[in-house]
């Protein structure tokens, strides 16, 4: 994704999540009383999510038109299918910033596909073809591993998918792994013009031609860079403009679960990310849960962002836990 005046914040302490319950009120017409009915939310397994992140990284950089990209795409589709999802492979030839044809593949897993009430969960699975933010200029044309920027959001959602198979929520859930989010114009080729259209190619394509004709969802949650050590998440600007009630819902859940040190009660800047096409083209209110840091000098997304250091060393199970348990809480409390 491309930074748009992104605000930065100091990392706070780490909190662990576990099995949680939320209460919904049920009124008895006969007695005129209100009782509490507990909603059982599954426990997110951070070890499982960590493994899913590592298995993606083990393929190497998942860049467009590469063997690793093909193999990892097959792995992700097979994983979703093994968890009981109806899987769609949406393939398309898309045009990169330099005019080259990129073989894109959006991977969609639909849980309870016949349900009318649906929630969309998404992340991008491709990795940046260029480490163009690396402090060593010699690395700028090398692809990154994308453990955090790519694999972390997908890893969290694969664990969510595993839980959906074991305990079905009251609604339908669609998990989308968008391709070609991170093939936007590299810094060494940037011009003074607006190049925002060169990013988020997979989500742009899906938003114009969804996997199901007339597709709709109540709301969407995008996960991007959600596995780094000491990660903090601010209320991203476009999310607040286009889906403020969803932001409120997610941040409230995180605070209730004890993850307020990750989900900071403060507005952040604006980020050009996959939630943009979901909001603006598909017209589904979608928010972006994305890392922001005050202490890192190279980028508010972390010193390892778009560098060769974005590897498994930066991934923290506690961060995966905070994000994953929060997402599960939101999904299972939807009626």
Per-region residue spans from a language model:
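Solvent-exposed loop/turn segments at secondary-structure junctions
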Residues: 62-64, 93-96, 114-115, 125-129, ...
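Acidic/histidine-rich catalytic neighborhood of metal-dependent amide-processing enzymes
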Residues: 141-242, 274
């Amino acid at each position: 994704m491309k930074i748009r005046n992104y605000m930065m914040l100091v990392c706070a302490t780490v909190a662990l999540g576990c099995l949680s319950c939320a209460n919904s009120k049920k009124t008895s017409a006969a007695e005129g009383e209100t009782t509490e009915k507990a909603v059982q939310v599954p426990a997110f397994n951070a070890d499982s999510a960590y493994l899913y992140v590592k298995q993606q990284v083990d393929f190497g950089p998942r860049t467009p038109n590469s063997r690793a990209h093909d193999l990892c795409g097959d792995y992700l589709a097979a994983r979703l299918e093994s968890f009981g999802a109806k899987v769609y492979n949406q393939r398309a030839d898309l045009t990169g910033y330099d005019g080259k044809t990129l073989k894109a593949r959006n991977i969609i897993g639909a849980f309870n596909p016949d349900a009318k009430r649906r929630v969309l969960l998404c992340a991008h699975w491709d990795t940046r073809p260029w480490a163009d933010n690396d402090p060593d200029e010699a690395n700028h044309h090398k692809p990154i591993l994308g453990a955090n920027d790519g694999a972390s959001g997908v890893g969290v959602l694969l664990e969510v998918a595993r839980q959906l198979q074991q305990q079905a929520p009251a609604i339908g859930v669609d998990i989308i792994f968008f391709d070609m989010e991170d093939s936007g114009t590299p810094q060494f080729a940037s011009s003074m013009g607006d190049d925002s259209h060169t990013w988020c190619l997979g989500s742009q394509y899906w938003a114009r031609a969804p996997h199901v004709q007339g597709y709709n969802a109540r709301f969407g949650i995008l996960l991007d860079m959600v596995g780094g050590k000491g990660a903090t998440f601010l209320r991203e600007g476009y999310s607040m403009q286009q889906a403020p009630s969803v932001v409120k819902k997610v941040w409230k859940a995180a605070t209730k679960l004890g993850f307020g040190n990750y989900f900071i009660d403060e507005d952040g800047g604006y980020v050009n990310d996959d939630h943009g096409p979901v909001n603006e083209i598909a017209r589904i209110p979608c928010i972006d849960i994305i890392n922001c840091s005050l202490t890192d000098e190279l980028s508010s997304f972390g010193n390892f962002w778009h560098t060769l250091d974005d590897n498994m060393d930066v991934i923290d199970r506690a961060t995966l836990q905070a994000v994953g348990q929060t997402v599960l809480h939101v999904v299972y409390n939807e009626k």
